[in-house]
Regions:
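Active-site-proximal or metal-binding-adjacent scaffold patches in catalytic folds
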Residues: 1-179, 188-226
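Walker B catalytic acidic pair
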Residues: 184
Length: 226
């Protein structure tokens, strides 16, 4: 069976690596000068590993889970807990969070986008400062950090030392958020998922295994449309 994959080349990359995204797509990250023949040979040598990864329970195909109705009595996830949604008529212009989501009733037509924007704001407020803190702890420096809308990755670290985090992470428990932050920052010390890489992550994220298991079991819930 032929393997389909996308090649992404970079003049800054020194090693060839293969990743399997959460939509089961295979991406080969290669130095600029790597020949097609070498890439094919490496992919072929990793065929069994790729099959195992694409069949992993965490890799699931579109469509994504259906969204919520966003009405009174429903709940929405935030930092690992479900909180009730309440539509209120109090003249307010934005969502308030008081151990429940208080959403202005007059914004009901835009309530999905309003809650999505609220999540984005909370992600910027909580994730980015923690990224700066953990960078200091690890003794690394990144070019910039951003919260993005990325369907298939919780986080990423580019060859230009930019780090990106999926806004949906803000729905997960904080120890899971911290694990993803540390995971991406560790790539600034070790590009590949080597034993050294995992030792770095585990030293800073004692709950690494628990966090990975949480994402394995709950990742699809984070993907629910709002």
């Amino acid at each position: 069976m032929e393997l389909t994959y996308t090649i992404k080349r970079s003049s800054r990359r020194r090693k060839l690596t293969i990743t399997v995204e959460r939509d089961r797509s295979v991406v080969v990250h290669a130095p600029e000068s790597t020949s097609e023949e070498k890439i094919r040979a490496v992919v072929e040598s990793k065929r069994q590993w790729i099959y195992e990864k694409t069949g992993h329970v965490q890799k699931y195909a579109l469509p994504h889970p259906p969204g919520k109705e966003m009405v009174n009595g429903e709940s929405a996830l935030y930092l690992g807990r479900q909180y009730q949604i309440e539509m209120v008529r109090d003249g307010s212009e934005k969502i308030r969070f008081e151990q429940r989501f208080l959403i202005p009733a007059h914004l009901s037509d835009e309530r999905r986008q309003v809650l999505r924007s609220w999540y984005m704001d909370r992600a910027k407020e909580k994730i980015l400062p923690r990224a700066r803190k953990f960078a200091v702890d690890l003794g690394v420096a990144f070019a910039n950090a951003r919260i993005v809308d990325n369907r298939y990755r919780w986080g990423s670290c580019t060859t230009r030392d930019n780090i990106r985090f999926n806004w949906r992470l803000i729905k997960a428990p904080m120890y899971v958020v911290d694990y993803v932050i540390i995971h991406e920052l560790a790539h600034l010390l070790e590009a590949n998922h080597t034993p050294r890489f995992w030792n770095i992550v585990r030293a800073q994220s004692p709950k690494m295994d628990k966090a990975k298991q949480w994402l394995l079991e709950n990742g699809q819930i984070l993907e629910e449309e709002i």
